[in-house]
Amino acid sequence: MNLAFIPSPSTGVIELGPIPLRGYAFCIIIGVFVAVWFGNKRWVARGGKAGTVADVAVWAVPFGLVGGRLYHVITDYQLYFSDGEDWVDAFKIWEGGLGIWGAIAFGAVGAWIACRRRGIPLPAWADALAPGIAIAQAIGRWGNWFNQELYGKPTDLPWALEISEGPNRVAGTYHPTFLYESLWCIGVALLVIWADRRFKLGHGRAFALYVAGYCAGRGWIEYMRVDEAHHILGLRLNVWTAIVVFILAVVYIVISAKIRPGREEIVEPDRDATPAEKDGSGEDGSGEKGVAKADAAAKDPLTKDEPGKDATAENAGAAGAAEKA
């Protein structure tokens, strides 16, 4: 055995004391918590209320899990509905099998419902969460390592992944596509954070950049995989999906930048207001002083930008005058 190879785990179950937890589920749970935690920090830094990201996630996550599983079952229906297969296995989500495309689409529906209930803009919420989702995917991909699934073509490279003999798999060393995608997602998260700082992305453009960045990587990584998949014109279905979604994301970024340049100012209806905001005091009688102080108190934990920094010159001047008073 080459010690440079990446070994596969002997079991896909993590023992948490008396509680057995499948590694796949564990990675997803950790990823969700990291995404919500980091998204909350970005949301608060932009003027939102702490806890809002988690409240919306309560809707988005279940919708996302259902959508991700549906996409997987529909696109790989032969695994569950062919002769000799048990259709009940389609409900065993803990054994692996989530399609990111369905998860994002259905998760967006759940988030939209929650955002409407809270009276906040969905694009702004998505922008705050975007890099956290990429990090969550980077963590979640390690669930494939636990399950010894979705690996690439055979290779003898030093970082090859050792796969043991098992149902529907042949022992050998393969490209660790789970690791490639995990590292790619970390890169996408850093790209979104940098671009958000550099270009003040708003109105859903940070989220669209995450989608485009992920699709660019998923296309070539998907091409390396050897698991069974449907093909269209010689390409795997997920490669075509990545191409189409990538184009849509880029088009959205371009059109959105022309129609709604800059970044929206996030103020939640139920956000804790300062006394100046509540009674409308301030130099211009509209509570600008209270808003300016609240915005100045919150800065993006990574970009160090003030949430109201890209407001109009008129508002900036009014806030400055109020501060001097």
UniProtKB/Swiss-Prot annotation:
The keyword DNA repair does not apply. It comes from the Bacteria. It is found in: Cell membrane. PROSITE patterns: LGT. Keywords: Cell membrane, Membrane, Transferase, Transmembrane, Transmembrane helix. It comes from Streptomyces griseus subsp. griseus (strain JCM 4626 / CBS 651.72 / NBRC 13350 / KCC S-0626 / ISP 5235). It is a multi-pass membrane protein. This is Phosphatidylglycerol--prolipoprotein diacylglyceryl transferase. Belongs to the Lgt family. InterPro entries: Lgt. Catalyzes the transfer of the diacylglyceryl group from phosphatidylglycerol to the sulfhydryl group of the N-terminal cysteine of a prolipoprotein, the first step in the formation of mature lipoproteins. Residues 313-325 have a biased composition (Low complexity).
